């Protein structure tokens, strides 16, 4: 009898505890290091703010590894509720209609207040459909800017950052005359020197609104503007005005060591530069070619967004919607922006950061935001939506490296890259049209 009573008590306690157990939500991400620790902190803050849901962040490696893991997990029916996908994977995610739960629909179905107009249009446009409905939630967005070594500039008698590429050339020559080895280097050469070059000058990178209007898009980055720019950079590589440093952000080392006085890199690189630079540095907007455009357009974003995957319970999705609302709060976004250097995704987060005096205390951190919100995005500046974009970027990297080495002229290199890239687009079209 005693054992029966004990058993009933144990069962009762188990039922009670299960009734109060928080619904778990798995979030796969690609944020390593300090940013990864911050992601854990954000999830914990949400978990501590309520008792219904528990978000469990899981680091899955770099962007490519995280996306690949999510695809494999979905096929095995073991997918997370949320996955962070970099911007070049957007077209692939959109094409996987049976795999994704569009954010705008999720928020509506879950009864969460959701106003797309509060987000920065230059950011949300990248992740919205043709009706302007957000398919994924922007999380860590960035845009390229120009960092420059103020100490080396002062030594060379230069008092301000170059605004145009013509000025970059003249400034670099003055720097070299003062003893600096190289004028500038770049990170992410395809993203900065072709994709954003095109947007900055309101020139198409691909047809059909850079892929936004359909999968039959074709690449056009072998046009006169792009060819002239890459040809000039090839000349600069020969005389030291430009120094190639690799396909990712390896150029940071040359900037830190003061080998190169200027560095085109993501706005999100600010925190790392501030931590590693032993000199006074400034941040300026990405240069443009004077005479090629009357007024430079907005640049386009890099980084990643959060996609919600199908195959979970209604209760889990209510939790996901609640978590995404939490991440969009001005205080949360402002803190993430100020910590990481990524752009604030809402106007409220931007305004709060300004009110808190962050931009005044950290000159240059507002540059990316100002540059991204220059005018209204056009068909050429709202972003890129290309299938097999990871492979296309690899093709572009090979083409640019052949120019830097002097093996091929810019026109031939870009023509070849367009031809090879279009073959990738046709494969994607065949699989998804």
Model-derived regions: residue spans:
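Glycine-centered hinge/linker elements that transmit conformational signals in sensory
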Residues: 172-178, 214-245
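Short, solvent-exposed loop/beta-turn-alpha elements that line the ligand-binding surface or hinge
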Residues: 104-119, 203-228, 275-276, 288-298, ...
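A structural signal for short loop-to-beta-strand junctions that line the ligand-binding cleft
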Residues: 72, 80-81, 112-152, 182, ...
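Extracytoplasmic "Venus flytrap"/periplasmic binding protein-like
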Residues: 41, 45-119, 151-163, 254, ...
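Extracytoplasmic/periplasmic substrate-recognition and gating elements
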Residues: 48-49, 76, 132, 156, ...
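Extracytoplasmic/periplasmic solute-binding protein
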Residues: 130-139, 144, 169-218, 260
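Hinge/lid segment of periplasmic solute-binding proteins
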Residues: 86-143, 163, 169, 195-199, ...
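C-terminal capping/gating helix-and-loop segments adjacent to ligand/active sites or protein-protein/ligand interfaces
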Residues: 129, 299-300, 364-420
């Amino acid at each position: 009898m005693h054992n029966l009573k004990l058993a009933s008590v144990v069962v009762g306690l188990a039922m009670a505890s299960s009734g109060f157990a928080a619904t778990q939500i798995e979030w796969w991400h690609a944020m390593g290091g300090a940013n990864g620790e911050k992601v854990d902190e954000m999830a914990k803050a949400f978990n501590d703010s309520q008792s219904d849901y528990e978000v469990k962040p899981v680091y899955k490696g770099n962007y490519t590894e995280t996306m690949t893991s999510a695809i494999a997990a979905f096929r095995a029916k073991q997918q997370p509720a949320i996955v962070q996908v970099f911007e070049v994977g957007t077209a692939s995610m959109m094409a996987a209609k049976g795999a994704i739960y569009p954010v705008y629909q999720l928020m509506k179905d879950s009864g969460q207040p959701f106003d797309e107009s509060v987000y920065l249009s230059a950011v949300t446009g990248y992740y919205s459909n043709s009706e302007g409905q957000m398919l994924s939630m922007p999380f860590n967005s960035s845009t390229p800017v120009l960092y420059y070594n103020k100490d080396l500039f002062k030594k060379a008698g230069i008092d301000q950052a170059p605004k145009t590429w013509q000025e970059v050339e003249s400034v670099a020559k003055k720097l070299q005359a003062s003893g600096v080895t190289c004028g500038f280097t770049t990170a992410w050469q395809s993203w900065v020197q072709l994709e954003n070059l095109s947007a900055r000058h309101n020139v198409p990178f691909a047809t059909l609104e850079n892929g936004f209007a359909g999968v039959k898009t074709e690449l056009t980055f072998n046009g006169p503007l792009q060819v002239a720019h890459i040809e000039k950079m090839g000349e600069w590589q020969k005389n030291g005005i430009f120094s190639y440093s690799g396909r990712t952000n390896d150029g940071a080392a040359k900037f830190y060591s003061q080998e190169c006085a200027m560095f085109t890199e993501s706005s999100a690189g600010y925190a790392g530069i501030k931590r590693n630079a032993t000199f006074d540095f400034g941040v300026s907007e990405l240069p443009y070619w004077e005479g090629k455009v009357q007024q430079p357009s907005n640049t386009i974003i890099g980084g990643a967004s959060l996609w919600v995957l199908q195959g979970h319970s209604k209760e889990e999705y209510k939790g996901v919607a609640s978590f995404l609302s939490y991440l969009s709060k001005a205080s949360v976004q402002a803190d993430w922006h100020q910590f990481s250097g990524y752009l604030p995704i809402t106007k409220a987060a931007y305004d709060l950061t300004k009110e808190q005096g962050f931009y005044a205390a950290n000159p240059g951190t507002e540059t990316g935001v100002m540059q991204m919100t220059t005018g209204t995005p056009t068909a050429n500046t709202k972003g890129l939506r290309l299938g097999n974009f990871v492979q296309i970027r690899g093709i572009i990297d090979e083409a640019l490296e052949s120019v830097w080495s002097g093996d091929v002229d810019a026109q031939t290199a870009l023509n070849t890259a367009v031809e090879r890239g279009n073959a990738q687009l046709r494969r994607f079209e065949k699989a998804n049209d």
